[in-house]
């Protein structure tokens, strides 16, 4: 049903609501998964959006859907039908993820590791659903060697030519912070509460004890750092489907696409959109970036 309504297209950083997505028949992964979760929940099927903030082995990120079936969470693409659950284009990519999380409403009492708790939501760690994990741990110390309580610790992967924090934690009274991640290397950055003193280091996947980070004034940090970051090796989640199931799925996808194409055919053509934009004193090029149904 979701495939009949929506197909993939890139968009800007502001996520469309499910209604806007279905009106336009387009959505990027975050919008497709938001739409699919809304549809599943509307039918009484427990579902949640999961998200890897940044890949470790390639640029960009991804969001998809988990659905609760027979006492377990299973994954699927947002508007990407497959022959069975736990089959998607990202079976291999997800096995190389350093961090996958989900946001749930309220206080969470499930089995997953809690990353942070806000007023209305809890962020939980779902990485172990997709790849073996290990504990990435640090102890942050002040310049005098005492534990730095409340320091911010950013666990980062290299993506789009920057160190992007996939998770940020605060240290406890012992200066400790730790998170379960995939078996890859991380860049870790720590800073005190006033953000006046900082420290950074590389956390290798095979580190057997917490790394010690000693905070120093920002001006005293090294000018350069040589490093090598290795992402987790691929160990693709097995895709289990018979040839008959896959053939049946392909036929349904063709039918789904034909239904969506019929809806898209009702859209105003670009020429009409440009004329309307001029009439309403809008920028024509901007009007071409959005598709609006009748």
Roles of regions detected by a PLM:
Residues 1-24, 259-287, 291-294:
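Secondary-structure boundary elements
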Residues 193-219:
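Structured interaction patches on ligand/partner-binding surfaces of diverse proteins
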Residues 134-144, 223:
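A short, amphipathic beta-strand motif
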Residues 70, 173-194, 203-207, 286:
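Short Pro-Gly-centered beta-turn/loop motif in secreted/extracellular proteins
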Residues 214-273:
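Compositionally biased low-complexity segments at domain edges in trafficked proteins
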Residues 1, 9-19, 24-116:
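Hydrophobic/aromatic-rich core segments of domains that either
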Residues 159-180:
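Short, acidic Ser/Thr/Gly-rich low-complexity loop/linker segments typical of extracellular
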Residues 142-162, 183-185:
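Short, ordered, surface-exposed loop/turn motifs in non-cytosolic proteins
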């Amino acid at each position: 049903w979701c495939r009949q309504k929506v197909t993939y297209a890139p968009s800007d950083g502001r996520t469309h609501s499910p209604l806007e997505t279905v009106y336009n028949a387009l959505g990027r992964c975050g919008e497709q998964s938001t739409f699919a979760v809304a549809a599943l929940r509307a039918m009484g099927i427990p579902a949640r959006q999961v998200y890897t903030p940044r890949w470790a082995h390639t640029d960009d990120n991804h969001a998809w859907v988990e659905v609760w079936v027979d006492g377990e969470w299973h994954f699927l693409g947002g508007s990407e039908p497959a022959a069975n659950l736990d089959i998607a284009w990202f079976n291999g990519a997800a096995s190389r993820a350093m961090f996958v999380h989900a946001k749930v409403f309220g206080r969470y009492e499930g089995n997953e590791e809690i990353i942070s708790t806000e007023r209305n939501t809890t962020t939980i760690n779902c990485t172990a659903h997709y790849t073996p994990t290990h504990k990435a741990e640090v102890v942050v110390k002040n310049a005098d060697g005492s534990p730095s309580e409340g320091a911010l610790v950013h666990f980062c992967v290299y993506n789009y030519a920057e160190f992007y924090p996939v998770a940020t934690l605060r240290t406890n009274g012992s200066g400790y912070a730790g998170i379960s991640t995939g078996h890859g290397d991380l860049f870790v950055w720590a800073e005190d509460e006033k953000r006046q003193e900082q420290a950074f280091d590389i956390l290798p996947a095979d580190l057997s004890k917490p790394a010690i980070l000693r905070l120093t004034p920002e001006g005293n940090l090294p000018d350069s750092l040589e490093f090598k970051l290795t992402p987790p090796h691929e160990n693709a989640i097995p895709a289990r489907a018979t040839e008959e199931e896959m053939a049946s799925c392909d036929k349904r996808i063709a039918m789904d696409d034909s239904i969506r194409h019929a809806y898209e055919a009702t859209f105003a053509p670009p020429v009409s959109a440009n004329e309307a934009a001029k009439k309403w004193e809008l920028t024509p090029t901007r009007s071409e970036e959005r598709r609006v149904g009748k």
